[in-house]
Amino acid sequence: MVDAMNQEWWKKASDVVNAFHKEKAAIPSNAQRAREDLKENIAFLRTYLEFNYNLCDKVVFSGSAYEDLNISGDNIEFDVMLIAQRSNFLYLTECNNGVCKIRSNSPFLNYPFDEDFNIDSEKYRSFFFGLIQKWSNMMMTHKKKSFTLVNHGVATQMNVNDEKGILWYQVDLVPCFEAKSSLISEEKFYCVPKPIPNQRLYWRLSYSIDETQIAKKLSNDAKKCIRIIKALFKLETNGLFTKFTSYHIKTSAFYLKERGNWPNEENLGRSIYDFLVFIKESLKNGELKHFFDRTINLLDKIEVSTEQLANTINGWLKNEQKFLTKFSSSIDANIKQLAIK
């Protein structure tokens, strides 16, 4: 299909995809104000954790809203890593497939240990939730803030409401330890309390800091491409791509960027076409490696037929008209007309 397309067609494709972005995939208008409110709240939380419990030496902001990857209509979502730097005392053991145990070289730290001084991730996660609950109650009393808290995987999810009590934005508050890779090594890793059934001592290695650094360095066009694919999969596929998450999409973009010559600086339509081709091939092969740990295949447990998803994308790419129609079917009538000219 690509060889048959001329410059005039690519210009049309770019116009249609840009219009789709404007209507379906733009950054939410209130995201910046949410970011400012979040930073104020986290400053209070850091003070609370650092000076009362010595459990926050460093804060790292991430998540789709912080990385400019949220789309209009989505909940505004942030991740915040609350890092206790303990590499002088903690080291990793039994690392495999992105999970590990954290062991202390000192019995005098006040953490939930087993008999071998491994930190119990499940107990620590519950302990951390309790601390956030106490802080939240103080914020509602003294700062008149409106929060609700829920357990959310490794994180405590904080739902922040506006003045009318309506959900404004969500934050995953992630407790994290910085630990050495082994007792004799100075290499440092970040670990978060991943819930694994019947394996409460295991933690997940986190690469959120590296991911955020790469995401923030992506060009505006690359971020636009990610938002467009997110909107396409979310809004135009009747839920078929629910299991192919925004994390899969962002990882695909990292690989395309690593290859070079992406995104196409002159034509957004071509960038999106190349993006879809990469995702289709990954799904067809049933393989999308974790960008920072390539022993992990992110499609291993996707719980949906990757072949079906690949065939669906292939249908969009079969010819020029199908590609244009996929982006114009739900938007302004003028753009629909442009797509069929």
Curated annotation (Swiss-Prot):
Cofactors named for this entry: Mg(2+); Mn(2+)
Biological process annotations from GO: innate immune response
GO molecular function: 2',3'-cyclic GMP-AMP synthase activity; ATP binding; double-stranded DNA binding; GTP binding; metal ion binding; RNA binding
UniProt cross-references to InterPro entries, sorted A to Z: Mab-21-like_nuc_Trfase (IPR046903), Mab-21_HhH/H2TH-like (IPR046906), MAB21L/cGLR (IPR024810)
Enzyme class: transferase
Residues annotated to bind Mn(2+): E258
Top-level taxon of the source organism: Eukaryota
Sorted UniProt keywords: ATP-binding, GTP-binding, Immunity, Innate immunity, Magnesium, Manganese, Metal-binding, Nucleotide-binding, Nucleotidyltransferase, RNA-binding, Transferase
Chain sites annotated for binding ATP: S64, E77, F78, D79, K230, S246, Y247, H248, I249, K250
Reactions performed catalytically: GTP + ATP = 2',3'-cGAMP + 2 diphosphate; GTP + ATP = pppGp(2'-5')A + diphosphate; pppGp(2'-5')A = 2',3'-cGAMP + diphosphate
Binding, GTP: D172
Family, per entry: Belongs to the mab-21 family.
Reported function: Nucleotidyltransferase that catalyzes the formation of cyclic GMP-AMP (2',3'-cGAMP) from ATP and GTP and plays a key role in innate immunity. Acts as a key sensor of double-stranded RNA (dsRNA), the presence of dsRNA in the cytoplasm being a danger signal that triggers the immune responses. Directly binds dsRNA, activating the nucleotidyltransferase activity, leading to synthesis of 2',3'-cGAMP, a second messenger that binds to and activates Sting, thereby triggering the immune response via activation of the NF-kappa-B transcription factor.
Official protein name in the record: Cyclic GMP-AMP synthase-like receptor
Phylogenetic placement of the source organism: Eukaryota, Metazoa, Cnidaria, Hydrozoa, Hydroidolina
